[in-house]
Structure formats: C-alpha cells, structure tokens
Amino acid sequence: MFTMIDVPAWLLILMLLFAAVTALDRILMPSVRWYLRRRLERAVERLNKRLSIPIQPFKLARRRDTILRLRYDPEVAKAIVTYAREHNIREDVVAERAERYAREIVPSFSAFTYFGFAIRAARFLSRSLYRVRVGTENTDALEAISPDATVVFVMNHRSNMDYVLVTWLAAQRSALAYAVGEWARVWPLQPLIRSLGGYFIRRKYNNPLYRKVLARYVQMATEAGVTQAVFPEGGLSRTGALREPKLGLLSYIIDGYRLGESRDVVFVPVALNYDRVMEDRTLIRANTEGARSFRFSLKPIYRYLRNLVWQKITGRVHRYGIAAVSFGQPMPLSAFMIDHQGHAETLGDELMGRISEVMPVVPFPLIAHAVAAGVRDRAALTGAVQARIDHARAKKAPVHLPRTDLDYTIDAGLNAMKLRKMLQVQDGTLILTNDGAEIMAFYARSIAPLMQDFAEGSRDTASI
C-alpha cells in the first residue's frame, strides 16, 4: 500500500484535474448554486415590490420540473392512453412524444434577461422606430383588478413590433408570457424568446395529443396567475382589417375555468396601430398570392440597423411616425361566464369588439382612409381628414397627431407616401400608383370600424 510508484507527469496532471473537477462538482458547486439562487430570489422579491402584478412562482420554476409536471398530469395521461389505443402504438412511445411536446412548449424564463436586457432593448427599438403614444390607459380600471386574478392582455396583431412595444409598455405591471408561432423558431430568436417567458405553439397542428399538452400548459399557467398576452387573430392581419378571432388559447382558458373555484381571469383589451407597419408590402403580397406562411429573415432588421447607424452619423434620423397603444375596459371571465354561459365564440367577438372601440387613430390611416374613399384633391384632403378626426373624437376614440397644425401633418404624411412610391402630387391632384392603392386600402381598414357610420353629409361625400 505504501510502495512508491512512478507516474508520468501528464497522468498526474490529468488525475489532479479530474479530482479538482469532482471536488468542484460535488462540494463547491452546490453551495455556489444555492448562493446564486438565493441572490436571484432576493432580486425577484425586490422586483415584485415595484410591479403591479408580481412574478408568479410558476414562472420561476425550473423548466425541467414544469415539463415533468405536464408530462405526468392526469389529463395528459388519459390523452396518452387514448392516443395509444386509437393509433395502436405502445403507451411508453406515446408518453415520450408527449414529453417532447412539453419540452417544445415550456419556456425557461429568466428575470434577469427579461428586465435587465429585454425591456431596455424594447424601449430603445420602439423609440428608434416610432414616436410612441399611449391613448386610453384606463388606469383606474386596471388598478382595480384584484391582485389575485390572472391578467390576460388580448391584442390585435398588426406587426411583429407588437411584441416589442407591449413588452416595454407593460414592464411596470408585470412580465408577460406570449404564445409565439413557429416563424420565430430560428436562432437566435428561439433561445431569446424562451428566456423571456414566451412559449412556442404550432397553430395549425391538430394532433389531439399535442393540443391536450398545450391546453394543460395554458391552464396551469392561468391557474397559477401568470400574466399572459394573447393575439386572438392567430397571426398578422394581411388586409389591415381586424381578423375573425381564432379561439384556441381562449377556449383552453375557458375549459380550465371553474366558476367559484378557479382563480378569476381578467381580460384586458389592447389596441395597437401604426403610421407604418414594417411588413405591410409583405403582408399585402402574401394576401394576394394566398401564401399560408412567412419565412423569418434577419435581413430587414440588419438593413434597418445599418440605415439607423448611418442616419445617426449624418444627424438625419427618420422614424416611421407614430405607434399608438390603447387599453380597453377589462372584462372578468367570472362575469362573462354568468352572462354568456362561457361560449368561446361569444368571448372572442366581445373582446375584438372592445379592441375596435379603442383603436388608436393615427395620421397615416386617416389620410389613407380619405384617399381610399376617393379624395384626390389636395385642398379637399384637409377637410376630409378633419371630418374623420371629428367623427373619431365624437366616438371617444383616441386620436394622435404629431402637431396641432393639420396641414403640416397631412404634408408630412403625403411626403412619406411619395418616398414610398405610393402616390404622386401633380398640380394639387393625388395620383395613386398601382402598389399605392393597395397600401392605402391596407391602412384605411385599420380604422374602418370607427368609420362605419361616417356621416353621409361629411365634407368629402362628393368625392366618395
């Protein structure tokens, strides 16, 4: 036992290295992990004190624990047995598939990434691209929501900037959990979105096992009080108009709700509108060609950042106009269940109606609505736009103008349209290009619900 042996130096170094790694892994690392976790918990406690809606423990749970909880959920277990029987597949194989679905769905939220990086990045990007305006805030109604209720922000989907804009504007209230489509399952978006609490869904995948796993995750998060953001339209509007609601996530929330037993759910309608939607031409082309999906590309982002740097250097920064957000009247699910017996279709229609009521009115859609209605004379355009502003304000819709000078606002809008080759102005007459007519209609439809009963005797009736 005490006999001396010769060991090569390289082997001794290797043995010492393995011993050091083992000591770190078994002795030091658990203590370090415990210390870091305690630091994180204290940081979250301090953060929760300044948030209107605290970050829930469910959101902070280890991702692996949530996956296993979902995998062994009784309802998922029943779905596994049913699926195995119907498709003549072994239950253990189906169980592995259910766990794979759970790994695909469950996020890995990082409070540091969300509040340390994402909020700052969202604020910078939003302010770089747009002049951000908040219309109807409904502050009193939002503050009156019970702290024990689960808040679900329900939004129209105009642009992929919606995620960025609402993440920043809701930062003082809570951390939002988004359902994100398959378009974003590319590097580096996928790991970033997971760390921000977003979960990926296959919108058109009707596999009953997958749907059950997804439904149970949504129901668990809702019952745990996780603040969520939902786009009931299920995708970007390709026509500019509000789309019919798709009821998947809303129906999961309703199905998991038990009146008088479950934690109450409060839906908060959020309306978004822009002077310029970055994807407008892509959406219009997809609608014309009947394309079913979009391929995500980093090229437009790279191109914009390159132009932004150049504009900063030359001192000529041009933003895309106004991006406006309005919050509608909150709707508790408990009251809805009593009044409507919990029909998801009725809930979807009611929420989309509340969104349209507070749709922000911004200059570009105002001008587009008048031009799409037939106004071609520049002198008549001022009166036509003013009539629409008066009509929107009479309906208590939030109207956002960059200045009180309406002629300046219209001239700025027309200049932007000319730069984008949508129209030309010759001798005071507006001449639309073929591309411009489609884009005008796209933006006009965003405020069309507010203008449905536009007075027949309005100042531009002769031009319509």
Give the ranges of each region predicted by the language model.
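Membrane-interfacial terminal anchoring regions of lipid-handling membrane enzymes
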Residues: 1-229, 234-464
